[in-house]
UniProtKB/Swiss-Prot annotation:
The keyword Calcium does not apply. Residues 24-93 form the KH type-2 domain. Binds the lower part of the 30S subunit head. Part of the 30S ribosomal subunit. It comes from Pyrobaculum calidifontis (strain DSM 21063 / JCM 11548 / VA1). The gene is rps3. SMART domains: KH (SM00322). The lineage of its organism: Archaea, Thermoproteota, Thermoprotei, Thermoproteales, Thermoproteaceae. Gene3D superfamilies: 3.30.300.20, Ribosomal protein S3, C-terminal domain. This is Small ribosomal subunit protein uS3. It comes from the Archaea. Keywords: Ribonucleoprotein, Ribosomal protein, RNA-binding, rRNA-binding. One of its GO terms (molecular function) is structural constituent of ribosome. GO terms for biological process: translation.
Length: 216
């Protein structure tokens, strides 16, 4: 048996795990979006699968006497094959600088547009909040029928933001949200470089230190 053949089951396992995580996230967003769902983290533990849900309205996601969380846990276990799902719901407003979560920014823009606020005004508000939160870089793109019958897009970019390579895939946060308005469907894409992120090509040069005086 070749080395590639011996490694194949490992790769298959990784692909299956990533596929399952994607399915879980898709289901959670579909089921809980109207209750203020923002994002989620999926962590494997010795006791099963821990799912951390970030939400703007945690009480609505939990439901009366935990009814919604219990329903979601049952579907994850029985239909998606998630091993012993344990769900924690965290209020995103209690996290330091929630504006650095792209889903938070995208949903706020979408909700404001749904209320009739002009898209440019909402984008500039988001830009101010991101700069105040200390983002190293960001990009906000709103696409759809913005001013004419033809679809177009409006984009605001600031700071340092990678779009390709390792940093773009693993360190830059990205979210896409769609909202249905009277003229049609609009897309909001947000990419954020967090304030605490250190790029893989970023380094600091320490200032030279004076050698200690030679012993007399």
């Amino acid at each position: 048996m070749s080395t590639a053949q011996r490694r194949l089951p490992v790769y298959k396992k990784i692909l299956e795990e990533n596929k399952k995580k994607w399915m879980i996230k898709e289901f959670l967003e579909y089921r809980l979006a109207k209750y203020g769902y923002i994002d989620s983290e999926i962590l494997k533990t010795p006791l099963g699968t821990r799912i951390v849900i970030y939400a703007e309205r945690p009480s609505r996601i939990i439901g009366r006497k935990g009814a919604i969380v219990k329903e979601v846990s049952s579907i994850l276990a029985n239909k998606l094959g998630v091993e012993n799902p344990q769900i924690d719901v965290i209020d995103v407003s209690k996290i330091e600088a929630p504006e650095l979560f792209p889903k938070v920014v995208a949903y706020r823009i979408a909700n404001a547009m749904a209320r009739g606020v002009r898209f440019r005004r909402v984008m500039f508000v988001a830009v101010r909040q991101l700069m105040e939160a200390g983002a190293k870089g960001f990009e906000i793109v709103v696409s759809g029928k913005l001013s004419t019958e033809r679809a177009k897009f409006e984009k605001i970019t600031y700071g340092k933001l990678y779009k390709i390579g390792y940093d773009a895939k693993n360190r830059v946060r990205r979210a896409v949200v769609h909202v249905l308005l009277k003229p049609g469907i609009y897309g909001i894409e947000v990419r954020i470089t967090p304030a605490t992120l250190r790029y893989s090509d970023e380094y600091k040069i320490k200032p030279p230190t004076r050698p200690e005086a030679a012993a007399q």
